[in-house]
Amino acid sequence: MKLLEGKTVLVTGASTGIGRAAAIGAAQHGADVAINYAHSDGPAQSCVAEIEALGQRAIAVKGDVADPQTAQDFVAKAVETFGKVDVMVSNAGICPFHAFLDMPVDVVERTFKVNLHGAYFMVQAAAQQMVRQGHGGSIVAVSSISALVGGEYQTHYTPTKAGVHSLMQSTAIALGKHGIRCNSVLPGTILTEINKDDLADQEKREYMEARTPLGRLGAPEDLAGPIVFLASDMAAYVTGAALLVDGGMYVNLQ
């Protein structure tokens, strides 16, 4: 059963990591996919090729989500190519680890612009298009377990992910009358580009694995299923929800 048959799905930050897994997962479930990416062309084009190999259409649109115009351009290009927007997966994010007391101003500002402002304007642009279309839609934002817990070297990052979580709650209310559902996924420790240097520390990695009841760290593909589910009509009565995808880490307090 393909959960997204005939849908058009947009995914930000999709050349690698969770975004890439979500884009490919959507294609596996029958969707055409537009991906946003900010840096290297190679990984983005290989993602497009992988989606096309599944028999679906795909485009890659380069742009920095910190610029509000990027959101408008991304949605417009998707509509030009596919004719509509059914699902937005707002995933793009950064986390340059740094101590709190000497945190550079530019690191704080860049993190907020990418993670929170970028999510806001992508969600808004997609919602505007969905309202124009008149047949509802689904928005899934990638927040983090860090929306619920702190991190010594993430004082600039955790507020942005709490903000994304809150954004989905508020937009669920604002957009419900238009038939647009808004939900978030909260990944735990997932092996991606964002934390590969941090988890290169074997002692740190083993500690995080031990904290996880399922006994392993997550892979990007572990997020694809939950994202596809929330995007699909299987979740037609789910909005304003937050789904932890963390191997049980959050509940392991002892």
From Swiss-Prot:
GO biological process, one term: fatty acid biosynthetic process
Catalytic reaction(s) noted: L-rhamnofuranose + NAD(+) = L-rhamnono-1,4-lactone + NADH + H(+); L-rhamnofuranose + NADP(+) = L-rhamnono-1,4-lactone + NADPH + H(+)
Residue numbers binding NADP(+): 13, 15, 18, 64-65, 91, 157, 161, 190
InterPro entries to which the protein is assigned, alphabetical: NAD(P)-bd_dom_sf, SDR_fam
Active site: 144, 157, 161
Keyword annotations from UniProtKB, A to Z: NAD, NADP, Nucleotide-binding, Oxidoreductase, Rhamnose metabolism
Gene Ontology molecular function: nucleotide binding; oxidoreductase activity, acting on the CH-OH group of donors, NAD or NADP as acceptor; quinone binding
A Pfam match: adh_short_C2
Top-level lineage group: Bacteria
Signal sequence coordinates: none
Binding site for beta-L-rhamnose: 144, 146, 154, 157, 189, 195
Spans through the membrane: none
Known pathway: Carbohydrate degradation; L-rhamnose degradation
EC number: 1.1.1.378
Enzyme class, first EC level, given as a word: oxidoreductase
Known role: NAD(P)-dependent dehydrogenase that catalyzes the oxidation of L-rhamnose to L-rhamnono-1,4-lactone. Also shows high activity with L-lyxose and low activity with L-mannose. Can utilize either NAD(+) or NADP(+), with a slight preference for NADP(+). Catalyzes the first step in an alternative pathway for rhamnose utilization that does not involve phosphorylated intermediates.
Family, as annotated: Belongs to the short-chain dehydrogenases/reductases (SDR) family.
Name of the protein described by the UniProt record: L-rhamnose 1-dehydrogenase (NAD(P)(+))
Organism whose genome encodes this protein: Sphingomonas sp. (strain SKA58)
Underlying gene: LRA1
